[in-house]
UniProtKB/Swiss-Prot annotation:
It comes from the Bacteria. Residues 39-107 form the KH type-2 domain. Belongs to the universal ribosomal protein uS3 family. GO terms for biological process: translation. This is Small ribosomal subunit protein uS3. PANTHER family: 30S/40S RIBOSOMAL PROTEIN S3, SMALL RIBOSOMAL SUBUNIT PROTEIN US3C. The keyword Cytoplasm does not apply. One of its GO terms (cellular component) is cytosolic small ribosomal subunit. GO terms for molecular function: mRNA binding; rRNA binding; structural constituent of ribosome. It comes from Chloroflexus aggregans (strain MD-66 / DSM 9485).
Amino acid sequence: MGRKVHPIGFRLGYIKDWQSKWFAEGETYTKQLHEDIELRKLISKELQSAGVSRIEIERSANKIEISVYTAKPGIVIGKRGTNVDTLKSALEKKTGKKIKLNIKEISQPELDAQLVAESIGEQITKRVSYKRAMKQAVQRAMRLGAQGVKIRCSGRLAGAEMARVHEEAEGRVPRHTLRADIDYAQVHAHTTYGRIGVKVWIYKGDVFPNQSAKASVEQPATAPASERRERAPRRNSNASA
């Protein structure tokens, strides 16, 4: 099942958190859910060149707080904050509610699965060798401290007549382990030959929810040699015979 289940959905409530944080019932839930989808589409469209990884939405009675995680905060904010003000006005006009925008920078985009997948997809669209793009992405992630990376591309790769799957991997990616911090993303690259699917798994290490990581990985100390029980002398079977 580790190959089938979504790596982030599998860990929700344990080491991963939801990207929409609010509660509603009945028709209100449906309305707010569709509103979240439209807000994410609008933000992704307006900030297409800003390297947006994820968008988190929190709601209160008359206010919506949106956190945008991006690799290029300068593009999002704009000169003297003009871009972010324009985006905020567009979101308030669409929802009719007060919007608070938080722009958060991603310091290491090479370790963000969404940004890595989008980068590979963009290179494939520009007819860069898919093998080269995948290998470079794996090497960069491992160089920056990832414990494991796996990238899979599927479709009519390099314009082949028959669709196939190509995979590049390094390190380990434990998909069954709940405490394993795995970042996952899936994007599509549109080429003249059809659509290419790109999936990225990045394993960043283990997360221990109820205790510090340092305490959990410490091994029990070995008893000193003076306190160890002496081993009984080996019985000589030849002598007894």
